[in-house]
Structure formats: C-alpha cells, structure tokens
C-alpha cells in the first residue's frame, strides 16, 4: 500500500469518526483526547512493528553470519578458499545493493552447495576408510571397526583432498601388501599340494586344518598373519618330512640294489621297483611324482627288503660259490695265483653251514679280492699281451724245430703247400723272438720297479722265465753250431777216407764206414757225445709255460 493510499484511508476514517462524534455530541475536549489516544496507539503499533522488523533484520543478519561461518568452516575442513561475495553493506549505503534476504538466499545456496560437497567428500572418506578397514581386517584376521571409527572421528575436521590422497596411498599400500600375501598364500598352497602329492597325503584335509577358506579355490582366502604362519610352518614341516623320507627311501633302495647285485636278481623282478630305484641319486626338488615318498611305498620297499633278506640266506652258499668261481676265472685270465689268504671253497662252505662266519663278510672279502685283481690286471694288461705273443712265438718255434727234424718235410703231399707257408711265417716270427724277449723284459723291469714287487705269471716270476728261455735258446744255438762243426769235420774225414780207398783193400774201407756210422747212429741230428748241455737240449720241444707248469 502506497503512502497516498494510507493518507486517504486515514482521512476517510477521521471523517467517519467526526460524523459519529457529531451525532453522539462529543465535546472537543473528548474528541482531542480520543485522537491523542488513537495517535498513541498507532505509535505503539508502529513501534512494535519497527521492533519486530529490527529483530527480523538482526535474525537475518545472524543467519547470514552463521551461514557464512558454516561455509568458512566447511571450506576450512576441505582446505578450500572461502568465496562469499558479500557486499550488501556498501551496496545498501550506496542505495543500489541487494537486500539482506537476497544475501541470505545467496549464502544459503552457497552453504547448501558446500554441505553437498562436504557430504560427497565424506562419502569418499568413508569408502576409503571402509576399504582400509576391510584390508586391515583381512591382514590382521580380526575386526578393526573401533580403530577405523575413532580415526575417522578424529580426522572429521580434515576432509581435504590432501588427507583423502593420504588415505588412498595407505589403501594402495595395504592392497599391495594384500596382493603379496595372496601370492605368498598361492605359492605356499601349490608347494603344499605338491608335497602332499609326493608324500601321499590328503591335501584337502591338510589345508583345512590350517584354515577352511584355503580349500576354496574361487572364494576369498584368509591372508591373516596367523594363516600365513600356519601355512609356512606346515610347508616347512612336510618339506622336512619329504627330506627324511627321501633319505630313508634312498638308504632302503641302496640296500635293495646291493641285494639285487649280490643275488643277480632277474630284471623282471626288479621292474616293479624300477621307478623307486631311479630316485637313488635324486635331489629333493627332483622327486615330484605322486606317492613317490608315501608311507605305503616305504612299507612296500621294506617288505621287499625283508623278502630279499630271507632269500639271501638261502642263496648265500650259491652266491659264495659263484663269486669264488668268478674270482678264479679272473685270476686264470690274468695268470694270477690266488694267495694263501684266499679261503678255500670247501672251507668257506663249511664255515657258512656251521654259522661260524657271516656269509656277507666272505662275499665282501671275495669281491674285495676280485676288485684288487681287476685293478692289478689293468696294470698287467700290456705285459700280458706281450707275454701271450711271446708264448705263441715259442710254440711256433717248437713246431718249426719239429718240422725241421722231419726228413719227409719236402715230400709233395696233400696240404704240403700250407705247411710250407706256416714254416715261412714261423721262421719270420722266430727271428723276432730276441727283440720280443728284450722288449718284454724291459717292460717287466719297469713294472717291477714301479710296483716294488715281482711280476708273477701263474706263480712264477716272468722275468726269470724270460732269462731261462734266453739261456736255453743260447744253449740250443751253441748245440746247433757244435753240430754244424761236427758235421763239417765228419765230412772232411769221409772225404779223406774216400781218397785213401783207392790204395786200401775193399774190406778195410767197409769196416771204417760201419765204425763211423755206429758212432752217430743214436740220432740223425744229435750226436751221442756227452755234452754239458745235452740234458737241456732235450727240452727244446717244450714251451716256457710248460716247463713252469
């Protein structure tokens, strides 16, 4: 309502009052008094209205101030600069400013906006803190609600992006720790599963005892410190068990292989445990086959060892005889004579049957002796090969001597050309004998110098055999020279007799011839003259080995 309208209304009311007063007959004094009362009442109404408006103004200003303070607090909590844009006082003074109500509406809108942003920021904080709480709970294995709630209440005055970023970094660190724990859990579970497979254990039962969630391959698994410790402890325990069983199995298999070798167990009987025997030199990481270290397998191997143990005693006599025969065969091939320390077969059997000795000890002695003989045979190999060649050459030499003494050797007959070829080869070989003997003697001398004991051939010193052969060969050579000289002398005597027979009577010539023939009739090649070497020359058809046999 405008001012003119108010004045018009006030005038009409006064006129109406004047009319009534006239009709009533009120005096001027009463009229003045009533007008004063009306004016006083109007003043009071105006004053009340003014006070009320002032109070409203104060309230609006206070609300504006409170809202501004709230906005400033929210900006402070969120670490943002307060942007209010309040200029109503200066604007009002200049007469063109916004009213307090307009300012209140504006600040309330700003407050609503900031409250909304704070609420959104708070939701972000709650989400991050809740994620942190969940990860901590998984890691610690216990509820962490109280800690998280108290942390949030203490930090509610700080909802800044900086604080939110710190929480995000903390969450990332915890999530990284969680990922590492999950990987560690998975690795340990795979290791435990492999150990259970090798040891023949029930994997589900084993892992359930640690934590039931570890059985579930799709759901969430426990990654708490307690679960990690229990899982690592279980892996360590079964790994040590694997090592113990592996060592036990390898010891059992070693004994089983010894039994197999000892008793020459057929391959078909060994086939059942062939996979087990393959692990005799395996490392812990190389044993991965299921049930390869199970209790059942160990018991099976132990049962087989018990069977072999029982079988061993029944076959021990046979084994001793066999090993002894093998030793004798090795000695025969290497021309080594068994020493007195080697127990005779008859005595060995009697000792085993009486129980006075352990058959295994006897076998060990025989195998040890066989090993020593084989070791010595390696060092004797070259000399033995040369000795065999020498003995073969000696046999050819004897055959050639027999052949040369055969008066019918040049008679043509079946196979005579083959005999002539052999004689040719024998002469070539015999011509090499001196060099062969010298080389062999040199080898033997070096060998005896290195070993510091004599080289024996079937119990005889081989060097002595060579020396004896050399002496005999020289004696035979001297005998052959003596025969040639004697034959030459005999030819000269015969020639002189033939010259004198022209003047002597026929009877005298005949008597001399008979006498001469009687003198050498004992042998077509060997004269009857007593010679210091005649006894040895009769041995010319024997070999060095036969002389020392």
From Swiss-Prot:
Q: Which cell locations does it reside in?
A: Nucleus; Cytoplasm; Cytoplasm, Cytoskeleton, Spindle pole
Q: Where is this region: Disordered?
A: 474-549
Q: Which GO terms describe its biological process?
A: microtubule cytoskeleton organization
Q: Where is the composition biased (Polar residues)?
A: 514-549
Record-listed Phosphoserine modification sites: 501, 546
Q: Which Pfam families match?
A: MAP65_ASE1
The organism's superkingdom is given as Eukaryota
**Where does the record place a coiled coil?**
36-123, 160-199, 459-492
Show which residues form the site (Microtubule binding).
412, 423
Q: Where is the composition biased (Basic residues)?
A: 481-490
GO cellular component labels? cytoplasm; nucleus; spindle pole
Q: Name one GO molecular function term.
A: microtubule binding
Q: Cite the entry's keywords alphabetically.
A: Coiled coil, Cytoplasm, Cytoskeleton, Microtubule, Nucleus, Phosphoprotein
Q: Which family does it belong to?
A: Belongs to the MAP65/ASE1 family.
According to the record's subunit comment, the protein's assembly and interactions are: Forms dimer. Binds to microtubules (MT).
What protein does this entry describe? 65-kDa microtubule-associated protein 9
Q: Which organism is it from?
A: Arabidopsis thaliana
Taxonomic lineage from the root: Eukaryota, Viridiplantae, Streptophyta, Embryophyta, Tracheophyta
């Amino acid at each position: 309502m405008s001012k003119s309208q108010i004045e018009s209304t006030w005038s009409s009311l006064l006129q109406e009052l004047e009319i009534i007063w006239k009709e009533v007959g009120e005096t001027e004094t009463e009229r003045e008094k009533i007008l004063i009362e009306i004016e006083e009442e109007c003043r009071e109404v105006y004053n009340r209205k003014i006070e009320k408006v002032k109070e409203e103004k104060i309230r609006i200003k206070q609300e504006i101030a409170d809202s501004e303070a709230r906005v400033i607090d929210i900006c402070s909590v969120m670490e943002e600069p307060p942007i209010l844009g309040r200029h109503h006082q200066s604007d009002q003074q200049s007469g063109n400013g916004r009213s307090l109500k307009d300012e209140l509406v504006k600040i309330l809108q700003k407050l609503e906006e900031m409250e909304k942003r704070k609420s959104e920021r708070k939701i972000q904080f709650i989400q991050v803190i809740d994620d942190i709480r969940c990860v901590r709970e998984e890691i610690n294995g216990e509820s962490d609600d109280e800690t998280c709630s108290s942390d949030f209440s203490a930090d509610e005055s700080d909802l800044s992006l900086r604080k939110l970023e710190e929480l995000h970094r903390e969450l990332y660190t915890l999530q990284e720790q969680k990922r590492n724990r999950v990987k560690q859990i998975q690795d340990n579970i795979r290791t435990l599963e492999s150990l259970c497979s090798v040891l023949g254990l029930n994997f589900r039962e084993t892992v359930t005892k640690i934590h039931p969630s570890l059985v579930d391959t799709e759901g969430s698994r426990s990654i708490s410190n307690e679960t990690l410790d229990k899982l690592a402890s279980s892996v360590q325990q079964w790994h040590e068990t694997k090592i113990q069983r592996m060592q036990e199995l390898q010891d059992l298999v070693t004994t089983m292989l010894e039994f197999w070798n000892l008793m020459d167990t057929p391959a078909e009987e060994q086939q059942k445990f062939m996979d087990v025997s393959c692990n005799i030199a395996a490392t812990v990481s190389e044993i991965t086959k299921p049930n390869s270290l199970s209790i059942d397998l160990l018991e099976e191997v132990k049962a087989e060892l018990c069977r072999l143990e029982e079988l061993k005693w029944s076959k021990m006599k046979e084994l001793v005889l066999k090993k002894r025969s093998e030793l004798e065969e090795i000695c025969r091939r290497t021309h080594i004579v068994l020493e007195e320390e080697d127990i005779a077969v008859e005595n060995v059997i009697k000792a085993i049957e009486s129980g006075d000795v352990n058959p295994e000890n006897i076998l060990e002695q025989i195998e040890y002796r066989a090993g020593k003989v084989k070791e010595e045979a390696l060092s004797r190999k070259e000399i033995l090969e040369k000795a065999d060649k020498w003995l073969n050459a000696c046999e050819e030499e004897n055959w050639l001597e027999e052949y040369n003494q055969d008066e019918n050797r040049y008679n043509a007959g079946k196979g005579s050309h083959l005999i002539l070829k052999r004689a040719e080869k024998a002469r070539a070989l015999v011509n090499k004998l001196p060099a062969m003997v010298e080389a062999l003697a040199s080898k033997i001398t070096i060998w005896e110098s290195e070993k510091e004991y004599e080289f024996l051939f079937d119990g005889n010193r081989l060097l002595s055999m060579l020396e004896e052969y050399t002496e005999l060969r020289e004696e035979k050579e001297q005998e052959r020279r003596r025969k040639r000289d004697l034959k030459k002398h005999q030819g000269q005597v015969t020639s002189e007799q033939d010259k004198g027979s022209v003047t002597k009577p026929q009877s005298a010539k005949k008597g001399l011839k008979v006498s001469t023939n009687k003198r050498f009739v004992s042998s077509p090649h060997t004269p009857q003259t007593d010679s210091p070497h005649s006894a040895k020359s009769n041995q010319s058809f024997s070999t060095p080995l036969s002389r020392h046999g």
